[in-house]
């Protein structure tokens, strides 16, 4: 069975499908920040879109009316349930094995501009990028940092399929162009910034950034098997 709590149509209409106090079956075999599965503890929002690969679907954006509704709904849910900004995530992030939605076209930056989700500290990203353009970090380091950020990933030390899938989902969320699943200087810099002290920031409506470091946040281990 598949269900979600809400569906947001392209014209901005919001359909309530499952009461928030009931479990919906939207997250699949999911994991985030050590918690699994996530259906019992999450609220699922499906967003109507034109799939990639459809004849007219390659570059069809999410309409402004739809995104306004999404931002309003996310803000309302987050305020009522005291949802931490770093726990507002996409399906691909909690189930990267074969899932990429909402995809690299989804304008996460709009949620960031509303202060709903954290973003990497731009100054740190620039600093790390200079460093990683000289030499990329090894795959084992990337795996540990991705696990610390919240992803389900095993520390194999190899650029294997599961690592490429997680990197691809990460790229789709945090840079949205050049989604290759391959590590590069910019991807590594984004990962390094997000997992550094004061590396995540929240933006206010004036465009100012403030550090986001939730209480109780801990480094999560990276399993080897």
Predicted ranges, named:
Residues 28-31, 63-86, 95-225:
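Cell-envelope/ECM-targeting effectors and their regulatory/trafficking segments
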């Amino acid at each position: 069975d598949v269900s979600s709590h809400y569906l947001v149509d392209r014209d901005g209409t919001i359909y309530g499908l499952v009461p928030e106090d009931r479990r919906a079956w939207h997250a699949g075999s999911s994991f985030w920040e050590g918690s699994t599965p996530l259906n019992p503890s999450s609220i699922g929002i499906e967003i109507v879109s034109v799939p990639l690969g459809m004849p007219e679907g390659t570059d069809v954006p999410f309409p402004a009316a739809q995104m306004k509704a999404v931002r309003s709904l996310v803000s309302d849910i987050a305020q009522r349930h005291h949802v931490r900004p770093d726990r507002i995530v996409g399906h691909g992030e909690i189930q990267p094995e074969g899932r990429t939605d909402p995809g690299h076209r989804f304008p996460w930056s709009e949620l960031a501009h509303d202060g709903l989700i954290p973003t990497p500290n731009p100054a740190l990203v620039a600093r790390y990028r200079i460093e990683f353009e000289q030499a990329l970090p090894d795959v084992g380091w990337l795996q540990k940092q991705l696990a610390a950020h919240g992803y389900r990933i095993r520390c194999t030390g190899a650029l294997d399929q599961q690592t490429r899938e997680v990197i691809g989902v990460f790229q789709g969320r945090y840079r949205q162009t050049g989604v290759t699943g391959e590590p590069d200087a910019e991807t590594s810099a984004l990962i390094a910034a997000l997992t550094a002290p004061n590396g995540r920031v929240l933006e206010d409506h004036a465009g100012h950034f403030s550090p986001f470091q939730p209480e109780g946040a801990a480094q999560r281990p990276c399993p080897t098997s």
